[in-house]
Amino acid sequence: MVRSVWKGPFVEGSLLKKADAARASGRHDVIKIWSRRSTILPQFVGLTFGVYNGQKHVPVAINEEMVGHKFGEFSPTRTFHGHSGDKKSKKG
């Protein structure tokens, strides 16, 4: 379900403060965030965020194509190791 237009995009307040501070300082450090539910705004383009996936912070470099998506979309939480193979087909 899509969010109402009249509400606007959701962004954590602390995330805006961290992004503004990073822009003002001019440093290109990874900004650690835990808010996977926040929407990526145009003012975040060019910054690198460390999005927490439950184990570690995954570095995500923001570009123009990511605007409007959520941070959590770019930091997978589950690891797929593949299905086990059939023993008959491996025998050859």
From Swiss-Prot:
Species this protein is from: Rhodopseudomonas palustris (strain HaA2)
UniProt keywords, alphabetically: Ribonucleoprotein, Ribosomal protein, RNA-binding, rRNA-binding
Gene that specifies this protein: rpsS
Function as written in the Swiss-Prot or TrEMBL entry: Protein S19 forms a complex with S13 that binds strongly to the 16S ribosomal RNA.
UniProt xrefs under PANTHER family: RIBOSOMAL PROTEIN S19P FAMILY MEMBER, SMALL RIBOSOMAL SUBUNIT PROTEIN US19M
Name recorded for this polypeptide: Small ribosomal subunit protein uS19
An annotated Gene Ontology molecular function: rRNA binding
Protein family per UniProt: Belongs to the universal ribosomal protein uS19 family.
Protein's GO biological process: ribosomal small subunit assembly; translation
Keyword presence, DNA-binding: no
Gene Ontology CC, one term: small ribosomal subunit
Pfam family, one: Ribosomal_S19
